[in-house]
Swiss-Prot record:
InterPro entries: DUF413 (IPR007335). Residues 91-112 are annotated as: Disordered. Signal peptide: none annotated. Involved in the organization of the Ori region of the chromosome into a macrodomain (MD). It constrains DNA mobility in the Ori macrodomain and limits long-distance DNA interactions with other chromosomal regions. Pfam families: DUF413. Belongs to the MaoP family. Residues 103-112 have a biased composition (Acidic residues). It comes from the Bacteria. This is Macrodomain Ori protein.
Length: 112
């Protein structure tokens, strides 16, 4: 991976991970460092803005297109990142579900 995925800028995703990859808890320290170091190259290869140069980059693009399963650390961490940012956000409410209406109990009248 020495000549593969070269980039000069560190990668940060302020929209999905405003406190950074390592502080969010989705990624291990190693995965967060890999994303920060090579994230721009991963993103450019995934979007087609950059042509793959090495064999490793060509295999990475195949993983991004869904043609093969992720094998290397770079492929696994990018797949994990993409799944995390594409999943719908879960939110929790404080209400108990359906709204309660007063006086809507079930009454049955019995003839005595």
């Amino acid at each position: 991976m020495a000549e593969s995925f070269t980039t000069t800028n560190r990668y940060f995703d302020n929209k999905h991970y405003p406190r950074g990859f390592s502080r969010h808890g989705d990624f291990t320290i190693k995965e967060a460092q890999l994303l920060e170091r090579h994230g721009h190259a991963f993103n450019d290869l995934d979007l087609g803005k950059r042509e793959p140069v090495t064999e490793e980059e060509k295999l990475f693009v195949a993983v991004c297109r869904g043609e093969r399963e992720p094998v290397t650390d770079a492929e696994r961490v990018w797949s994990k990142y993409m799944t995390r940012i594409k999943r719908p956000k879960r939110f929790h409410t404080l209400s108990g579900g359906k709204p309660q209406v007063e006086g809507a109990e079930d009454y049955t009248e019995a003839d005595d």
